[in-house]
Amino acid sequence: MILSDLFHETYAALSANKVRSGLTILGIVIGIGSVVAMISIGQGAAGSIQASIQSIGSNLVMVQPGFQRGAGAGPVSAGRGSATTLKQEDADAIQKEITQALAVAPEISRRYQITAKGKNTNTQVIGTVASYSQVRNVQVDLGSFISEQNVRALSKVAVLGPTTRDDLFGEGTNPVGETIRVNRVDFKVIGLTQSKGGTGFTNQDDIIFVPISTAQRFLAGDAYVTTISVQAKDAGSLATIQQEITDLLLQRHNIADAQLADFQVLNQQDIVQTASAVTNTMTMLLASIAGISLIVGGIGIMNMMLTTVTERTREIGLRKAIGAKRKDISLQFLAEAVTLTFIGGLIGIILGWASSLAVTAFTGIATKVSLPAIALAFGVSAAIGIVFGYYPARRAAALNPIEALRYE
Amino acid sequence: MIECKNIVKTYRSGEIDTQVLKNISFKINDNEFVAIMGPSGSGKSTLMHIIGCLDTPTSGEYLLDGQDASKLSADELADVRRQKIGFVFQAFNLLPRATVLRNVSLPLVYAAVAKEEREERAKETLRASAFPEGFWHHYSNQLSGGMMQRVAIARALVNNPALILADEPTGNLDTKTGAVVLATFQLLHQEQGRTIVLITHEPYVAEHAERIIHIRDGEIVSDGVNRNRRLINNDH
Ligand SMILES: Nc1ncnc2c1ncn2[C@@H]1O[C@H](COP(=O)(O)OP(=O)(O)OP(=O)(O)O)[C@@H](O)[C@H]1O
Ligand SMILES: [Mg+2]
């Protein structure tokens, strides 16, 4: 049997019962479509989480206070990051000792009620140093960022995030030169940062930066820091720097057992890896739920093919009588099943693509239709056709020609 | 050449074995026109299935051109059928959603003949059987019974088989169209020298053959030359 005949027979058979073929295809369309849509939503989420991790800077090692486990600590923990175990001196020591570090930016962050011109908002105030803008990839839109001079002089100056600006002064206004009041202390606005896009868990645009010295003196009243961001030269030195900082701080805090450290040193690569592990799991979960509908679609194919084989028993008998071999018959039915899934897969991919675009358009959730996902969907749909078409095709091929001919 | 040696065919349904063919032996030489005649249920179709390599006997030997069919696999039997045998069934068994041309060329599809040659041969065969050209592209389920049977005959001939097996080819036709079909067989036999085995329960139909094998209850009751042969005037 020649390939073109196989196409001819397949077309003739499928078009003979258009409604049934259409409904069976629909099952596959829904299955493949939802798999494609779910994978694209999962990958979109992965992409935006990666982007937001990258947006906090590149090649970062972050030191945060931890809670001390062990003797006397008790079972209740105040939660990671809330402890006050990192001091300004730790930051200074890192700056001095870790020579591989490109820049070190300690910060103290807390939420305060802010008032300006009778409006008020509650937002994150970060006391930090000049290098923060480089380390954490903060771009200034108007005015300037905190300078080293500001830090030395304990200047009462502030740099606003765009969302905070919108809340306090209205959208699109220039806040430079205005005064804001934080915790009964007046700060002069000297700059406005560029928007980072408010994705992720915290809105990086709803924020106020002040000099770290000012924050420690006038707002917090102590010399603790909440995070020390260290930028490495390149991704390759991240692990070394992470180790060096750990060793340094253990020594400074007089802790012998690294298990009992009262701080934690996070490496941005680890964060990225953890996040991608999470998003991959999520994508897998979404795809497997969608995969169930694909299996249901496959069962639909099998159901239709079994019905077709029964209906066409006489025809199969005749074909065998005039010389068709088992292979010819099974190939014919397999081709029908694969064609159904192939068409369904094609429409499903288009539909899945369209619906993920629609999701982005209407909900703003990032989606990403990737070529491998499409290739996978295509492969899966063809495989579904083969798997679920195999049994009916074999059944057709195994029919005894005489039994098939006398079948009423 | 066909040779049946002590052929027995037993069907088993549940616990009961029914012997449909009991010790059938005969020979049919090339270029013979033989009718196998017997009442309904006597085992004619069963015998034809064995002759046509659609089935194998329970015991005994069936030789087609000296080859023992019972030793062949299902696919090898398919090859034999495709190369040597043309079938005409009582119920026509055409593909309903296919054109006349497609139906006639179907055996060539399985012989992997290219499309152009296939169509050419199908047209030739249809022309030779004087099948009106206006109907070549009709779907087979739009034809009359007589026309369907002529399509079925053309399909049986398109492979140019040496042996033509016809099971009640006139059973669904009126006398007149039946006569046309019988005339076609006589012509194929006389002018093209094909071996024809015609299965029927009607003595009138059997009398168109040269030789009549009479079976009853799975046994041959008589086998001999047809002395009052009906010849249809074949000068159309
Ligand atoms: N697959 C089968 N299983 C069981 N019995 C069968 C089978 N095929 C045929 N038979 C039996 O074998 C007997 C002969 O059947 P067969 O079809 O050969 O008769 P026939 O001579 O062709 O009859 P008719 O003229 O009615 O076509 C019948 O009694 C039938 O019931
Ligand atoms: Mg019969």
Model-derived segments and spans:
Chain B
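Conserved ABC transporter NBD signature motif
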Residues: G60-D68
